[in-house]
Regions:
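Acidic phosphotransfer microenvironment of two-component signaling modules
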Residues: 85, 107-108
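Residues at the C-termini of beta-strands that transition into short coil/loop
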Residues: 19, 106
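Short acidic-hydrophobic, aromatic-tinged amphipathic segments that line or gate anion-handling sites
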Residues: 101-105
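Amphipathic alpha-helical interaction surfaces in cytosolic regulatory modules
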Residues: 22-100
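Conserved catalytic submotifs in the C-terminal HATPase_c
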Residues: 10, 51, 107
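Short, charged, intrinsically disordered terminal tails
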Residues: 108-116
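Short beta-strand/loop segment at the start of cytosolic alpha/beta domains
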Residues: 1-17
Length: 117
């Protein structure tokens, strides 16, 4: 499946839903490109739902780290939601699970931002 990212803004929080394989050949910079669009409009809170991400390689891990860095440099926050055990295992190996706040789903991540699901 070709990698896609769907975005929805809710009360100054952007929900990004990633679908497919987050790899060098498929993921490219789609997440970061959307983050740049929304941060340019003043949004600083993001939830990245990875529930439908089938696979992540080293490029995908690096892309997540770059997204985190971009958002943090602008004084924002990015939380992960719906991370599968397979993807979480990769994040743990790369120690990114210590960088991101990880939630079971979008509702829990929204609550962490103080919003109703």
């Amino acid at each position: 499946m070709k990698f896609q990212v769907h975005a929805q803004e809710m009360e100054r929080i952007v929900l990004l839903e990633a679908v497919g394989r987050l790899t060098l050949t498929e993921g490219q910079t789609k997440i970061r490109d959307l983050i740049h669009v929304f941060t340019g409009n003043g949004v600083k809170k993001f939830i990245l739902n990875l529930a439908q991400v089938e696979f992540i390689d080293s490029y995908g891990v690096g892309e997540l780290a770059r997204c985190y860095s971009v958002v943090r440099q602008l004084g924002g926050e990015i939380k992960l939601a719906g991370v599968s055990e397979k993807v979480l295992g990769v994040l743990q190996i790369c120690r990114l699970h210590k960088l991101f706040e990880i939630y079971s789903g979008e509702g829990a991540a929204l609550q962490a931002f103080g919003q109703r699901a």
